[in-house]
């Protein structure tokens, strides 16, 4: 039991006074020497007490007044002994913060408060009139600005005179719209509540005290406050940026043309212009162009949009009339869409392709020359007669893209991102993994530059001044999540960590978008209605599982038992994912054997993606895990059925895709391992291996050059291995890991953790 803090209630004040007057200074000085770090963290008011003025009294201009209780005791509603540190803080080991100023008796007169309300009401009236003139039909802007909070509380603001002759010291008027923000936006209090009984300390603290100091300290603070407001009086919306030399937006964003006053008007006012001569030819308003006074049409509603070809084609030799281009694009959308090309939304691209061909597609939001050639480079590979043009299209797109990306004056566009991803898949099909990785990484960098992972309303593009329609917002969402799936698929195939992440995006989910009339030539003729949104959402979930377990299974250096534990967890999670799929996306052995369903590329791509994920994770552990071996054998049987049905349905594999290409490659590698493990079933493995080898090396080539490249690399590796066997006896390899060990020891010493293992 500790002794009571106050032995005698009657002697409490005398004891404190005597103890503080005799021993306070020496005790504080000794405690200062003992713990200097604690003293530095105390408030400036406590420093005044330590100077020897007395713990229970404070001197201010010759007058002596009693010190207040410390902050901790006031918050806990405990009696403070007015010591320093007080008994309660000492017992609880808290920092004793002394309040050196009593604000409870400092009150402002009702006359002064009324004058503030009158002044703000007059400002709100002027602001309301200004907003109604600029935006006559937009009541939402007034609601967002909260104009009228004080004005509505006053019976007649015009009769209240503004008089600041009160004896109360003048205070700066906060630059807020009807709301006081105290500290860091944690507490808000309407101005109209000032005619009620409020705590006077609020008026002399928080925003008043802070802004008074800021306004009096420097003129720069006042200028900064004005610059932070738009001409309409709203606070400027800052984009979500991190520490950067370019905090106001992307690095390369520059408008191509100076913004004129006409381009700042709403779209309705531009289209309603009665005098076409007021607009010069070629004036750009974002990505919509005023040509001879007519605003180029945008996608207002996909449900009512119709693509009519030939209306704006004055030149029969234009790119959208080239039969080779049309056939290549038809192959692209018939056989490869959606798949890993979800990011090239078909309806918006074709709308721009057929309607915005003038000015070389410079004014189209979702179509560009480099994107057309990139898509044609991919689509032309699926027709033997057009394969010779594939490299030509690729070089044209590549040359244009590199000029755009590495030109400081160019503007980041979403079509640039789409084209770079198309070239990445083109290079992967040729077996150039390095170039494919470079192009995909460049696409993501350009996308980040325009903020494509953020809300589609705040993308840094040239159409920021035009209000986007709901369909355009949904198209942008579809493009981003398509890029997300493309990035994760490429990283899965190349064994890299993905770049795009769900946690770093504020993009809303992609909704189902309708098919537009006029795109029949670019659709796969099947018996099922195309659905993209639902499969896309579930692929995002699957990619998230892959992202989580990739680091645990393939990156972190753990023993094989720990990796197998993570692998079993991953297999169970993916199994649960498949079982939880909606009925439309579920499949079984019966559905796989159905020729109409399993050969439909708009449906089977979802299955191939699942199989590729399972094979990629289980292939390295076939020798170590019975579960992995069983999973691989079951998947190989399903893939054999799918590929066999595709060959029987269409007669060949010239219209195959990368999903089929990589699934064949994974199946071949798995079968080679199974031959080593189960030598008793050699005949079965050899038969299946011949099946996949035939499709991979003879059927999918020459549409894809990857099989040929792998065959050449295998022969080259065999020659190099033979040469190394003859030279290995004469080579001494010296590996110096001293720096690595030194860094590991330093990390262990600083953070108290051990490194996974030493090399």
UniProtKB/Swiss-Prot annotation:
DNA-binding stretch(es), residue numbering of this chain: 70-96
Gene3D superfamilies recorded: Zn(2)-C6 fungal-type DNA-binding domain
Record bears the keyword DNA-binding: yes
Locations listed in the record: Nucleus
Note: Present with 736 molecules/cell in log phase SD medium.
Region (Disordered): 1-61, 229-254
One GO molecular-function entry: zinc ion binding
Function, in words: TY1 element enhancer binding protein. Binds to the DNA sequence 5'-TCGGTGGTATTATTCCGA-3'.
Database matches in InterPro entries: Transcr_Regulatory_Elem, Transcription_factor_dom_fun, Zn2-C6_fun-type_DNA-bd_sf, Zn2Cys6_DnaBD
Residues modified as Phosphothreonine: 22, 755
Motif window: 9aaTAD: 744-752
GO cellular component, one term: cell cortex of cell tip
Protein name from the UniProt record: TY1 enhancer activator
GO-annotated biological processes: transcription elongation by RNA polymerase II
Matching PANTHER family: TY1 ENHANCER ACTIVATOR
Record keywords: Activator, DNA-binding, Metal-binding, Nucleus, Phosphoprotein, Transcription, Transcription regulation, Zinc
Composition bias, Low complexity: 30-51
Entry comment, domain topic: The 9aaTAD motif is a transactivation domain present in a large number of yeast and animal transcription factors.
């Amino acid at each position: 039991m500790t002794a009571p803090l106050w032995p005698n209630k009657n002697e409490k004040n005398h004891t404190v006074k005597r103890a503080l007057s005799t021993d306070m200074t020496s005790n504080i000085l000794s405690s200062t020497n003992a713990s200097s770090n604690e003293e530095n963290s105390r408030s400036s008011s406590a420093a005044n007490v330590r100077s020897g003025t007395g713990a229970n009294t404070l001197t201010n201009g010759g007058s002596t007044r009693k010190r207040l209780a410390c902050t901790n005791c006031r918050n806990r509603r405990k009696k403070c002994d007015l010591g320093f540190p007080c008994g309660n803080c000492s017992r609880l080991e808290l920092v004793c913060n002394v309040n050196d100023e009593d604000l409870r008796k400092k009150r402002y007169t009702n006359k002064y408060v009324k004058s503030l309300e009158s002044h703000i009401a007059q400002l709100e009236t002027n602001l309301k009139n200004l907003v109604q003139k600029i935006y006559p039909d937009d009541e939402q802007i007034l609601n967002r600005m909260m104009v009228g909070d004080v004005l509505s509380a006053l019976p007649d603001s015009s009769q209240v005179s503004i008089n600041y002759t009160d004896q109360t010291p003048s205070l700066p008027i906060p630059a807020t719209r009807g709301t006081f923000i105290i500290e860091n936006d944690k507490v808000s209090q309407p101005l109209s509540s000032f005619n009620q009984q409020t705590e006077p300390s609020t008026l002399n603290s928080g925003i008043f005290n802070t802004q008074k100091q800021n306004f009096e300290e420097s003129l720069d603070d006042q200028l900064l406050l004005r610059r932070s407001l738009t001409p309409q009086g709203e606070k400027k919306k800052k984009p979500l940026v991190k520490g950067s030399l370019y905090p106001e937006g992307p690095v390369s964003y520059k408008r191509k043309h100076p913004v004129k006053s006409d381009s700042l008007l709403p779209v309705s006012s531009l289209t309603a212009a009665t005098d076409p001569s007021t607009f010069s030819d070629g004036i750009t308003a974002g990505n919509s162009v005023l040509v001879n006074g007519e605003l180029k049409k945008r996608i207002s509603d996909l449900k009512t949009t119709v693509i009519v070809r030939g209306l704006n084609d004055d030149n029969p030799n234009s790119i959208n009339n080239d039969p080779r281009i049309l056939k290549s694009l038809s192959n692209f959308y018939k056989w490869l869409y959606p798949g890993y090309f979800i990011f090239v939304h078909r309806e918006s691209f074709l709308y721009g392709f057929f309607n915005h061909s003038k000015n070389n597609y410079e004014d189209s939001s979702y179509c560009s020359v480099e994107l057309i050639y990139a898509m044609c480079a991919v689509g032309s590979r699926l027709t033997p007669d057009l394969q010779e043009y594939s490299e030509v299209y690729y070089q044209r797109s590549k040359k244009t893209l590199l000029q755009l990306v590495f030109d400081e004056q160019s503007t980041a566009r979403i079509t640039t991102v789409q084209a770079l991803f198309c070239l990445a898949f083109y290079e992967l099909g040729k077996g150039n993994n390095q170039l494919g990785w470079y192009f995909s990484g460049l696409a993501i960098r350009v996308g980040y530059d325009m903020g494509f992972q953020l809300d589609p309303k705040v993308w840094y593009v040239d159409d920021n001044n035009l209000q986007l329609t709901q369909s355009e917002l949904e198209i942008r969402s579809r493009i981003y999540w398509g890029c997300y799936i493309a990035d994760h698929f490429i990283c899965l195939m190349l064994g890299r960590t993905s770049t795009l992440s769900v946690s770093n995006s504020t993009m809303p989910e992609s909704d189902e978008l309708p098919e537009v009339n006029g795109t029949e030539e670019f659709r796969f003729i099947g018996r099922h209605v195309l659905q993209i949104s639902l499969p896309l959402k579930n692929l995002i979930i699957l990619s998230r599982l892959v992202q989580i377990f990739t680091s645990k299974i393939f990156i972190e250096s753990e023993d094989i038992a720990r990796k197998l534990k993570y692998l079993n967890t991953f297999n169970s999670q993916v199994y649960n994912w498949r079982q939880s799929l909606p009925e439309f996306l579920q499949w079984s052995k019966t559905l796989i054997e159905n020729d109409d369903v399993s050969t439909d590329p708009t449906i089977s791509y979802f299955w191939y993606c699942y199989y590729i994920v399972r094979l990629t994770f289980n292939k390295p552990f076939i020798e170590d895990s019975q579960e992995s071996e069983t999973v691989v054998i079951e998947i190989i049987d399903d893939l054999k059925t799918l590929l066999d049905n595709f060959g029987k349905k269409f007669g060949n594999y010239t219209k195959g895709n990368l999903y089929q290409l990589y699934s064949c490659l994974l199946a071949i590698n798995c079968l080679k391992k199974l031959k080593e493990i189960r030598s008793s079933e050699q005949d079965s493995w050899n038969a299946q291996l011949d099946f996949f080898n035939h499709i991979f090396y003879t059927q999918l080539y020459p549409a894809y050059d990857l099989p040929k490249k792998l065959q050449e690399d295998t022969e080259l590796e065999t020659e190099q291995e033979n040469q190394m066997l003859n030279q290995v006896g004469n080579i001494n390899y010296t590996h110096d890991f001293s720096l690595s060990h030194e860094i590991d020891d330093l990390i262990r010493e600083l953070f108290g953790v051990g490194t996974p293992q030493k090399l």
